[in-house]
From Swiss-Prot:
Official protein name in the record: Conotoxin ar5a
Protein family (similarity comment): Belongs to the conotoxin T superfamily.
GO MF assignments: toxin activity
Disulfide bonds: C2-C11, C3-C8
UniProt keyword annotations, A-Z: Disulfide bond, Secreted, Toxin
Tissue expr: Expressed by the venom duct.
Subcellular location: Secreted
UniProt comment concerning the protein's domains: The cysteine framework is X (CC-C-C).
GO CC term, one of those recorded: extracellular region
C-alpha cells in the first residue's frame, strides 16, 4: 500500500 505524508512509499 501507499503511505507517507508528502511522499508515497511502500509500507
Amino acid at each position: 500500500r501507499c503511505c507517507g505524508y508528502k511522499f508515497c512509499h511502500i509500507c
